[in-house]
């Protein structure tokens, strides 16, 4: 099999091509089309070329490679900007870490998120410092754990939705402060309308660890993610065509196989309806010096229209910049012309996905991979 060690881990996204059970014998002297020049498509292209005798065309509808991980230098400040929101590379697998580092230098980075709530700044994920701040206490870990147990709503024995799941384990005080307003803004509905599975494990730490990620390997590429992806496809037998949008029904008969990394419902021209997504928009601001002192500040209050502010200079703390650039991020329902970000995965979406998957399994010359094609967060 060609893809036993192909992984990419960006935030919560892990591409694992190990499920593609295509023998090397069937991949010799072939021509392939990959739709999408993000991490999924470009890692796949690199591994196909490395392990087989083939030529590859990659199409992407945008004017750049990198997908939502695209990074670029801001012309005004010189700061490396995460164009579609923050992405931190994190993994526990050494083979993944070694793989990406073979295409560019990564430097250590600890992602520390702060939260603005009722005019005060707190530490996230919810940890011992957060609990002591919110309640004006100086609990030890054991005391904090015992205290939260008194706040938990034990009358909820079988949580049926997001809100019940939160109230069952952390109580209304922490829920109202850090989860209710933010969740409502991010998902565009009441938390009671969201499945409990979204909040499978309440992110509460009974220590002062405020590192957002627990992974062994975490870092930021010195030359940005787009620099890494550019090197992945710098091979004569890989041809990347930008500003080329895939349209359902396009003739792909010139290719032995097509690998699709776009939304699975788009491949089928939304014939059963659109899968539910939330998208985000960004408002760009410039300032002198340092705006907020951290990479990411979440705004938990419902009356603040944006969900978070990302200040990009803090991703690369080894660089020095006199000015700063930051994004205010707004969440909204995904329209036909919007970029899909977060799958809603409500019950109606799961039913719809099952129908698309059944159709996808019937396609012998097409494979679906990546977060959009598999409808995963």
For each feature predicted by the language model, list its residue ranges.
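Glycine-rich FAD pyrophosphate-binding loop
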Residues: 49-73
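Active-site/ligand-binding neighborhood in enzyme catalytic cores
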Residues: 118-123, 128-257, 261, 268
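Dinucleotide-binding Rossmann-like beta1-alpha1 core, especially the glycine-rich loop
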Residues: 77-153
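Short FAD-binding loop at a beta-strand-to-alpha-helix junction that anchors the flavin cofactor
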Residues: 361-376
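N-terminal Rossmann-like FAD-binding beta1-loop-alpha1 element of flavoenzymes
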Residues: 32-57
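Ala/Thr-enriched low-complexity intrinsically disordered regions
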Residues: 2-5, 26
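Mid-domain catalytic core of redox enzymes
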Residues: 51, 244-359
């Amino acid at each position: 099999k060609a893809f036993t060690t192909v992984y990419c881990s960006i935030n919560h996204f892990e591409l694992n091509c190990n499920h593609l059970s295509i023998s090397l014998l069937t991949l010799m002297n072939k021509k392939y089309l990959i739709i999408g020049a993000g991490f999924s498509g470009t890692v796949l292209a690199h591994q196909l070329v490395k392990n087989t005798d083939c030529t590859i065309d990659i199409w992407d509808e945008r004017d750049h490679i990198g997908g939502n991980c695209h990074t670029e230098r801001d012309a005004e400040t010189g700061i490396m900007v995460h164009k579609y929101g923050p992405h931190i590379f994190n993994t526990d697998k050494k083979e993944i870490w070694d793989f990406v580092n073979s295409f560019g230098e990564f430097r250590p980075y600890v992602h520390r998120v702060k939260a603005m709530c009722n005019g005060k700044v707190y530490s996230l994920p919810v940890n011992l410092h957060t609990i002591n701040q919110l309640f004006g206490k100086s609990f030890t870990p054991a005391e904090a754990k015992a205290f939260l147990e008194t706040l938990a709503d034990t009358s909820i024995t079988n949580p049926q939705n997001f809100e019940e799941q939160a109230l069952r384990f952390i109580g209304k005080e922490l829920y109202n402060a850090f989860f209710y307003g933010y969740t409502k803004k991010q998902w565009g509905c009441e938390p009671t309308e969201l499945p409990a599975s979204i909040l499978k494990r309440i992110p509460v730490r009974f220590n002062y660890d405020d590192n957002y990620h627990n992974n062994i390997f975490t870092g930021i590429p010195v030359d940005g993610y787009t620099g890494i992806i550019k090197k992945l496809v710098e091979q004569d037998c890989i041809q990347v065509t930008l500003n080329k949008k895939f349209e359902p029904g396009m003739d792909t008969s010139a290719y032995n196989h097509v690998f699709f990394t776009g939304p699975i419902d788009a491949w089928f021209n939304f014939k059963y309806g659109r899968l539910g997504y939330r998208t985000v928009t960004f408002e760009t601001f410039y300032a002198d010096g340092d705006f907020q002192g951290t990479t990411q500040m979440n705004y938990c209050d419902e009356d603040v229209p944006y969900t978070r502010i990302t200040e990009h200079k803090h991703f690369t703390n080894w660089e020095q910049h006199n000015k700063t650039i930051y994004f205010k991020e707004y969440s909204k329902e995904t329209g036909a012309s919007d970029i899909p970000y977060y799958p809603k995965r409500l019950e109606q979406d799961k039913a719809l996905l099952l129908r698309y998957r059944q159709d996808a399994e019937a396609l012998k010359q097409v494979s679906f991979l990546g977060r959009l094609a598999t409808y995963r967060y």
